Amino acid sequence: MKTFQLRTLSVFLSALGAFSYSSVAQAQLMFSQYVDGSSNKKGLEIYNPDGITINLADYEIQQFNNGGTAKTVAFRLQGSLASKQKFLVGRSELQTELGSKVNQVAALSFNGDDAVVLVYKGTPVDRFGRIGERPAAGWGTAVSSLGNSFKRIETENPALSIDATAAFDLDHSWSAWTNRNDFSNLSGSTTQPPVETVSCSSSDTAIADLAAATQEQTYTVRGVITADYRYANGFSGFYVQTPDTKARANVSNAIFVYISNSSAVKGGQVGDEVILRGRLTSYQNQLQIDQLQHDIQTCNSNMANQVQPISLELPFASLTGGSTNSPQRYQGMLVKLPQTLTVSENYNYGRYGELSLSLGRLYIPTNLYPALSPEAKALAQKNLLSKIIFDDGYNNQNRTPWLPSNFSAANTLRSGYQLKNAEGILEYRFNGWRVQPVLGRNQPEVLTQPNPRQSVLTKNANHIRVASFNVLNYDNGATGFPTERGATTQAEFDKQHRKIVSALKAIDADVYGLMEIANNGYGPDSAIAHLTKALGSDWKYVVPENLDRLGGDAIAVAIIYNSKRVKPLNKPVVLDLGDKNRTTLAQSFQAVRGNKTFTVIPNHLKSKSCSGVDASSTDADQKDGQGCWNPTRVKAVDQIVQWLAKNPTQVQKQNALLVGDMNSYAKEEPILSFEKANYKVLLNDTKVGQGTQAYSYVFGVASDANGNGGAGNLDHAIADAALYPKVVRTFAWHINADEPTLLDYNEEYKTDEQKALFYGEDAYRSSDHDPVIVDLDLNGKDSSHPDDDKKNGIFDFLSELMNWLSQLFKRN
């Protein structure tokens, strides 16, 4: 056993270059304080107990995360440290707090269970923590190393070397600060590292060579400032790029220069050719120069035309590597997007100012193809290469959007709109490739024609209209505000209520299947009663027999109907689908005109969120695009199919129409299970639906790293074989999925001006899901009849034409 331990230690020390300790002549530097403040205010204070000045360039700090034995952070110290003096290394957040007390900025990322080691010429001489160990509760028994800052008890370090894999005794070597954020006892060295002067005649390293250069070293760089983000809430820096005549092919010729807000460094503006010297490092997987110690020198102030934007076209050939059409090839450079690109997602537009752009609308792969099929995999890969984020050039949140000009609830930016002539700086930030606009350059043109807001298609008076509507946690606050899942205040709820009522009235359905309505009973103060009353005296809601509420969740499904157009037939029937899927409800109706029957069954299956899932179960995410809880949703579908086979409402002709948020895209296993049982999935049907263009929800274009984001329909209308021939058409009314989230009823994070500017008492962004609408001709010939196909086609064409003309005249 001893032999094994010695051999292990020998291998470890060899890996650090510890072949000889003879070069260690003085008392060693040591960690004197370990700083783990909140909000990333992290640092390490280093003390020189020796009687002579120490060259810090001989020392390196290494970090080993999460019990690993391979270093995750490593950087050399800079300058010198006089006898009995201290040197403070810290993150930029600590420098913002302490200013010049921080002698060297470094990307420290320890969390109390990560080891940090001080290394002298390859030999470990001090440490905090233990390499190869990740204690669940941190090191220490009296006070845990997690979430605390510490001061060293010892004041000398006689060790020639240490074993950083040996047990770590926090209790006897370190004392915890009373307040982890009290930095008053930190004192960096007053002896600053020597600053090498830089002038326009100084030699420099080509920017193109920096990608292969050693990081944590200083370099002199020359280039033209193409974009300057040193303004309020900007990115605290600027981009420099090599002039086109000196640029190198197939490699980036630009780099970001970071200058913290607390820095006194100044100089340079867009169009200047400058020279500067600083440390090469990486932040968020993007190279940058930081720690500038002198002002930026301008060598030529008329160089703006020497850097022209490079055309960046989608799709990329790859997202990595230096191919001629990979984003890495253009990183940091001034680019233009010559293609007219579609806004495929605006989910983060209100919060972060981000728009996802792509070649046409991107679709969820499993909305078009079965999970793990070659087609689904190919589409996911295509999606990854066909998108880019267009940002707003700011680093703060909840700004008023800048596109289009004078953005408001009436002047929105929908998914499906297009941007033309966009340009800016291509960069990698927040785990995504994006283009940052440049102040003073051309603003892109917003094209609204590809996907304008449209009125709902007019209903034929002889048809029955059934609609599915997810009402986004509609809760009237019967027991007060804030509600469990819905509005926080009465004012918010009033806004939500007006928008949803506006949408319901515009749709003009005869029956609605609702999802996400508060499960607070059926009395006069209930959410369902409150909503139904707002539609008028003709409207009623279905009350399950002998039930105070439907299932045990905070939200439920419900049915409301126009009593002058349809009347309930027999009693409603309930199916309990267990504690994961919401309880479902079935009610048969008879049309007042023609007396034909049909049955409406609203459903809301288990979400794709992985919250609460057992990671070892089949309900966990199988990385097939279907998310978590897929078997649970399939099981629910099987239960529903078996239940409906027994005709639970006991009518002569069931004509079942299932509607709702199935939390499953059109080609995922739950929906395919319906098809196997001879049900027809209407919205995706090529005859009566919208085929491959169907969607009711947009999600994950920017955030999904596997290409599974895009448009698709979680919301469905599914007919049994008997009802399908009576379906005239099925469509999603795109009032929600394409609209920015900041137009909804929520008031959080909005100024008073924004609250007024972003809100409209209309149907748009009344929810996050689009309503799905089904028109039924219960009295006519089956829609599958060829003659009916012609009639319905003419009717649809005329209806669409009238709708288009009305929108045209409104715009004019």
Predicted regions and their residues:
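Extended non-catalytic accessory segments flanking core domains
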Residues: 132-137, 179-487, 491-501, 534, ...
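Bacterial N-terminal signal peptides that target proteins for export
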Residues: 1-11
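A structural motif detector for short, solvent-exposed N-terminal "entry" segments of globular domains
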Residues: 25-66, 110-111, 196-235
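N-terminal signal peptide c-region/cleavage motif recognized by signal peptidases
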Residues: 20-22
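Intrinsically disordered, low-complexity Pro/Gly/Ser/Thr-rich segments with frequent PxxP/GP/PP motifs
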Residues: 71-96
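Acidic glycine-/aspartate-rich tracts in secreted/extracellular proteins
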Residues: 36-39, 48-53, 65-69, 92-96, ...
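Composition-driven, intrinsically disordered low-complexity tracts enriched in small residues
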Residues: 784-812
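Divalent cation-coordinating acidic motifs and surrounding scaffolds
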Residues: 82, 94-95, 131-144, 157-160, ...
